[in-house]
Amino acid sequence: MNDFNRGYARSIPADRADMSVDAGLRKFMLGVYNKVALGLVVSGALAYATSSVPAVRDLLFVVQGGRLAGVTPLYMVVAFAPLVLMLIAGFAMRNPKPETAGALYWTIVSLIGASLGSVMLRYTGESVAATFFVTATAFGGLSLFGYTTKKDLTGFGSFLMMGVIGLIVASIVSIFLKSPALLFAINVLGVLIFSGLIAYDTQRLKMTYYEMGGDRASMAVATNFGALSLYINFINLFQFLLSFFGGNRE
């Protein structure tokens, strides 16, 4: 996305290896986690609104008998807009201001939240809540691992990003093949890849904190982009887990 995105963090100096005890780092990471948590709250509220308020729901979804029967052209715009925004930001935002980074974060979170109304219409509320709890638990454990491990995870970054590209290609292929086996493999790999990205991005944020040298503006930007990375990882893990734990509406 910019200098704060994947690949910008260099190796950690040996004298900074024990970063888990740094109070400044803990404060920085807490800011990231708080932003992710608030983003999930906003997304949940928007998902509920777009699935439960008829005037809003009908702008995005075609519902028959209380079940999702299709989507509208506006939904397609909302669903793909976050990807477009991230691509534009990746090429255009080299030294963004904190306000710009914050606006980008909340815009993407809002768009994704609105599109998640489809999840509320497709799966039962109980299964969505249970899967969210499983995702939150897994996210906490994986991020804690990335935060505390002394193993350098940098080498996994390229592998994981190649995996994401592979998932996108496989998902497009599955639309035409309609193979249950391929879909199952995609869902399994999706869980594994985004689990790895949660740990990887957490450690990457630690590296970034030390590279910024305490600059407040840089940390504000990094907080927004770091939260965005972890938020997207969470949402993707949640959706892949729903393929296993989600109960379809009757």
Curated annotation (Swiss-Prot):
<feature type="transmembrane region" description="Helical">
    <location>
        <begin position="36"/>
        <end position="56"/>
    </location>
</feature>
<feature type="transmembrane region" description="Helical">
    <location>
        <begin position="156"/>
        <end position="176"/>
    </location>
</feature>
<feature type="transmembrane region" description="Helical">
    <location>
        <begin position="225"/>
        <end position="245"/>
    </location>
</feature>
<comment type="similarity">
    <text>Belongs to the BI1 family.</text>
</comment>
<keyword id="KW-1003">Cell membrane</keyword>
<feature type="transmembrane region" description="Helical">
    <location>
        <begin position="101"/>
        <end position="121"/>
    </location>
</feature>
<feature type="transmembrane region" description="Helical">
    <location>
        <begin position="180"/>
        <end position="200"/>
    </location>
</feature>
<dbReference type="InterPro" id="IPR006214">
    <property type="entry name" value="Bax_inhibitor_1-related"/>
</dbReference>
<dbReference type="GO" id="GO:0005886">
    <property type="term" value="C:plasma membrane"/>
</dbReference>
<feature type="transmembrane region" description="Helical">
    <location>
        <begin position="128"/>
        <end position="148"/>
    </location>
</feature>
<keyword id="KW-0812">Transmembrane</keyword>
<keyword id="KW-0472">Membrane</keyword>
<protein>
    <recommendedName>
        <fullName>Uncharacterized protein CC_3663</fullName>
    </recommendedName>
</protein>
<keyword id="KW-1133">Transmembrane helix</keyword>
<dbReference type="Pfam" id="PF01027">
    <property type="entry name" value="Bax1-I"/>
</dbReference>
<feature type="transmembrane region" description="Helical">
    <location>
        <begin position="73"/>
        <end position="93"/>
    </location>
</feature>
